[in-house]
């Protein structure tokens, strides 16, 4: 089944399942881009989850290879809600546009909504700030909110440069979130800290008294 069918049947994905699929999508995109292939129509309908659990990209009808594909690819490709702002402005096809579409896709799979609302083919959308993930998914960690906000940023230079960079950030953020935080001594043993401060204060006062008397 496609991820669009999965979303329709089950609704927004649990965090653990979402992270697994996000990693698969980013690894697949990274492999495509290293081969100089731009998919140009990333969306849940074009992502198939097989019985073997493998995620596969479908529909390469709009795929573009810079320097090899005929024409310059300036025609508006793909599905409007997944198109990057620069694609609407007629920018030359680039990996950044695939990464933006992947960001919208992953946002939708997690939240059940589009970050900028649904965009119709006849619209000329204005992109401001995406709706925070936490509005739809209060259970999402703060780092995930920040990660997806960067993925679907309206300015290309604010997004991830490559699928590999995005995947690394995803893995590192999750790992850091799972690591136990070393609590400060004041939190762990407040009585010990206050006793030590009291003793230190007493010693300072005694030293000052001795200095003043000599």
Labelled PLM ranges:
Residues 179-214:
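Regulatory extensions appended to serine/threonine kinase catalytic cores
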Residues 46-57:
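Conserved protein kinase catalytic/activation segment
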Residues 79-178:
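C-terminal lobe helix-coil module of Hanks-type protein kinase domains
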Residues 2-13:
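AlphaC helix of the protein kinase catalytic domain
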Residues 21-22:
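Activation segment signature within eukaryotic-like protein kinase domains
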Residues 27-37:
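Protein kinase catalytic-loop region centered on the HRD/HxD motif
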Residues 55, 68-77:
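Regulatory activation segment
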């Amino acid at each position: 089944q496609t991820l669009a069918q999965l979303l329709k049947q089950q609704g927004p994905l649990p965090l653990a399942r979402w992270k697994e699929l996000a990693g698969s999508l980013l690894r697949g995109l990274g492999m495509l881009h290293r081969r100089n292939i731009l998919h140009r129509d990333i969306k849940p309908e074009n992502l198939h989850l097989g019985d073997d659990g493998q995620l596969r990209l479908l529909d390469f009808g709009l795929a573009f290879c810079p320097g090899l594909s005929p024409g310059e690819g300036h025609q508006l490709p793909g599905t409007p809600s997944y198109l990057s702002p620069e694609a609407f402005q007629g920018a030359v096809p680039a990996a950044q546009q695939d990464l933006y579409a992947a960001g919208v896709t992953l946002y939708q799979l997690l939240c059940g909504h589009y970050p900028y609302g649904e965009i119709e083919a006849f619209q000329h959308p204005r992109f401001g700030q995406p709706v925070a993930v936490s509005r739809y998914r209060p259970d999402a960690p703060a780092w995930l909110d920040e990660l997806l906000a960067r993925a679907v940023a309206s300015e290309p230079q604010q997004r991830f440069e490559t699928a590999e960079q995005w995947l690394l950030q995803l893995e590192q953020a999750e790992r850091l979130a799972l690591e136990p935080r070393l609590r400060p001594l004041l939190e762990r043993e407040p009585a010990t800290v206050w006793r030590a401060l009291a003793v230190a204060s007493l010693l300072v006062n005694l030293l000052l008294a001795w200095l003043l008397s000599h």
